[in-house]
Amino acid sequence: MDNSTCSSEQEDAANRCRWFRINWKWCKMGSYRLGINIRLNPVVSLVSALIIWGFVAWCIIKPETVNSTMAEWKTWIPTTFTWMYIRAQDAWAGFIIYLYFSKYGNMKLGKPDEKPEFKDATYFTMLFGAGTGISLFYFGVAEPVWHYAPGFYEKRHYNRYTDNQRAQDSINLTLFHWGIHEWIVYVVVGLLLAFVGYRQGLPMTMRSCMYPLIGDKIYGWIGDAIDIISVVCTMFGVCTSLVLGVMQLNAGVHRLESSVEVSTFNQIIIVWCVMACAIVSINSGLKLGIRRLSETCFALGVFIMMLVFFFDAPCYSLNLLVQSTGYYMQTIVQRGIHTDAFAQLGNAPDRKEATGWMDAWTISYWGWWIARTPFVSMFIAKISRGRTIRQFIIATFAAPVAFSILWFSVFGGAGLQMERKAALANITCDSALGRTNASESLNGLFRPSCRDENGMWFDVMSQYGDMGSFLSALSLISIALYFVTSSDSGSLVIDCLSANGDPKPPVLQRVFWALTEGATATALLYVGGNEALNALQTVSIASGAPYTIILCFMSKALWKAVKVEAGDLDPNGPQFTTGLLDVLSTPTVESVCKVIISIFAPWYSMGTAAGMVEKQNGRMWTHMLIMALPFYACISMLVLERLCVFSGICYVGYTLLFGFFAYATGVRNSIREKYEINGNIAEDFFAVMVLYPFAAYQMEHHMKNHKPTNHIQNGHCLPESCRIPLGEMEKLMDPDARKTDV
């Protein structure tokens, strides 16, 4: 069916296709009255709520244990997975750039004749407000200053160049963190979600992103797992931004009214005050509430930026803008692949290294961006209908990056200028004026690097004479409004995820998730205290790690989706006779037994398949022997290492195990090539290494049952199993007709 024939009625009905599990089967879900109107996926909603509220309870009951555990995570994850974070970001960026210039760039996210729902200016303000608005106020001044002067994690570079070069490098590092590598994760997922949602009629939920790869299995436990992870990641990603905003709000209010102390208690009060405003905003919906708030926030931010631009030194800001843009483009590849490999070892003979810099900055940011991906991407997808792929990439990739460069050139430049002026005036962290806790400046100057990060923004605003208080007050209003916008958008996205993509979930459910956001932010503040920023960084890194793997699969899904839609890939072409995870979704006694046997003897099924590929049963046992020897040798060596019989022998075992994976990859690759199954050797290696029992069963099953099958459905509209008959659509659209008394 051509996508142009999908009627608007079908698409509206598809958006309201909801499911719940009864006896391991999926059924359509309507609205239920339990004294109130609710529409949700109970599996996703309950499990997600239990995980999040369990974390909140853990933070409140055992804050010391949470702190120590977070410290361990913060060390272990970057040490182990820095390479994965760095490489994945670069790969996604390269993929999106290639997609932009490909022939698929003109494909529209919707019907061919559809127009964009929002004007470009409104669209930009909405996606920017959901993306990074509130965080730019927090880091606009602070991050360049931190990179310029020795901070908590020291400087990345030590005495390598002049002070001017050091200042420029601080801007370069800041732009690296807030540029292409931030927005690339939102582009990949947002584009995929909009594509499958508006062109193929799938529900607007993260599980739909995997439909091009696993078909109808997204409506089973795999889809539940994806949505649960997405809800949890979204909650922690949004709360990171909210807590940063709260800490800055507290510092700003204290600056204007000294009787209001900077304390965790006051910050918690601010959380719930602003959360109350967000709950009120929830009733206004997307087009009125979030749209108008986003436009107001963006306008206020631009107004403040222009005032600072003219108040400070316009020529200096313009010079810095042009210069920083050039340096950013010049060094983006070099910085994008830098992992601080030597610095993380912490053994430099000259001691000129910052061992904690990478995990405190780049990896923390990458984890934060990835954790926010479900939230920002789904929100962007919701407002992107009617745009082409190329228009989408430009709007969500180039425009926000350009604005971020402008923002940091103005505010970061102002902060660096104050820092350098204070240094020339001999203001140090021990000075009576301008020092860490000073309430008064020295001739309008503070030393930002000596000050609390929450108040650096207001230190810079205060230097503009009589306008300082006005700018500070205006900044507080902007931060508070961005807080409301982020909370409102976050609760909307989380509610959609927990309701199987329902575009208009009940308000009460959004209120529940807004309250959950407030509770999570409160827990992070309570645990972190004065070190709340460390707690936030740890949560971001930890929640972003598992989603990095999911994002890699989503990139593959996006590429497959556009190729199928363009007719360059036959979705009904040759496939493996069974999917890797079919045994979990549709288990049989035979398949379960085969997988269990393959856990301990994968060589048997793999060797059988290898012999059948070559049609030489005599070589079957040769293949089995070649794979069995390294597999069992690895296990034996791990046992010897554990028993302290032979120190270091486990590494020999790991090497042999890698050889087993490589050989098994060759077997799976030969099966694919023989039967012309779509894929590549990298996918084969990943399948064998991560899911070797399932891969072994899949290979043997295919060789014994290799009749052509249409294993994965890829219709342009919603699959038949999920479509709502047009005759029932009016009932679904009528709230009274959908309600059932329980």
Where are the language model's segments positioned?
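N-terminal alpha-helical transmembrane segments of multi-pass membrane transport
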Residues: 2-166, 556-561
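Helix-loop-helix module between adjacent transmembrane segments
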Residues: 16, 36, 51-59, 93, ...
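Transmembrane alpha-helical segments of multi-pass small-molecule transport proteins
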Residues: 16-23, 47-61, 86-94, 161-162, ...
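Membrane-water interface regions at transmembrane-helix termini and the short interhelical loops
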Residues: 32-37, 63-78, 99-116, 169-177, ...
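Transmembrane-helix boundary/entry motifs in multi-pass membrane transporters
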Residues: 33-43, 77-83, 112-130, 159-182, ...
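Membrane-embedded translocation segments of transport machinery
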Residues: 218-480, 502, 526-532
